[in-house]
């Protein structure tokens, strides 16, 4: 199986480098989600060997509707690297994206390691420095987004780029469950949501991640960014698009795409 994992990981990596999406890989993953994560990890190690630095994790499949659609009962996660970080309002070269779609999220920044067993919600809150509004630019190495849970897990949870807002906000006094979200493109509303759409509360998603990573031996560390999951529908991006997301209590963030090169 390790040889097959290496082959599939290489195909996904080549798809990213060549900017040419490939056919779904799920038909070659007989070991289920565990095997898909093993494939993901091969490419994580490839990125580290290339000099990339881990900056955090992203959580996907936090919507009950999407979970039902894909036939799963849990979220998934991927790894964020420094090469994926984009400043608020910075122009994103279209060549950095692959079938990009945008979704608005609550980002959490961790200030203390969460490396012990039986992490509680209070542990998570105490370890969180602040929250920020975020736009995640997801991308798929699988052609036409023809994915199921195995495809997206193997493909680093369809991670692409991420944009964080500039103004950190402490959790105290925030009601992230009821925080409304509006995302606009060129001034037109394209996505509407609320914190409760993310596993009932963005902190629920982050707690799931923290516990899962401890079990896998790769816990959240001080300084990590956690993209907690979409608050509303994701929207396909086109060259030249400018997205702005506003999240109640957190402010706004913009993702600005260059014209096609």
UniProtKB/Swiss-Prot annotation:
Gene Ontology CC entries for this record: cytoplasm
Enzyme Commission number: 4.2.1.80
Gene Ontology MF annotations: 2-oxopent-4-enoate hydratase activity
Catalytic activity, reaction form: (S)-4-hydroxy-2-oxopentanoate = (2Z)-2-hydroxypenta-2,4-dienoate + H2O
Keywords: Aromatic hydrocarbons catabolism, Lyase, Magnesium, Manganese
Temperature dependence: Stable up to 35 degrees Celsius.
Signal peptide start and end residues: none
A Pfam family recorded for this sequence: FAA_hydrolase
Any one of the GO BP annotations: catabolic process
SUPFAM superfamilies named among the record's database cross-references: FAH (SSF56529)
Enzyme class, broadest EC rank: lyase
Superkingdom classification of source: Bacteria
Residues that span the membrane, as ranges: none
pH dependence per the entry: Optimum pH is 7.5. Stable in the range of pH 5.0-8.0.
UniProt activity-regulation remark: Strongly inhibited by Fe(2+), Fe(3+), K(3)[Fe(CN)(6)], Ag(+), and Cu(2+).
Cofactor dependency: Mg(2+); Mn(2+)
Family to which this protein belongs: Belongs to the hydratase/decarboxylase family.
UniProt xrefs under PANTHER family: 2-KETO-4-PENTENOATE HYDRATASE, ACID HYDRATASE
Main function: Involved in the modified meta-cleavage pathway for the 2-aminophenol catabolism.
Assembly information from the UniProt record: Forms a complex with AmnE.
Protein name in UniProt: 2-oxopent-4-enoate hydratase
Gene name, Swiss-Prot/TrEMBL: amnF
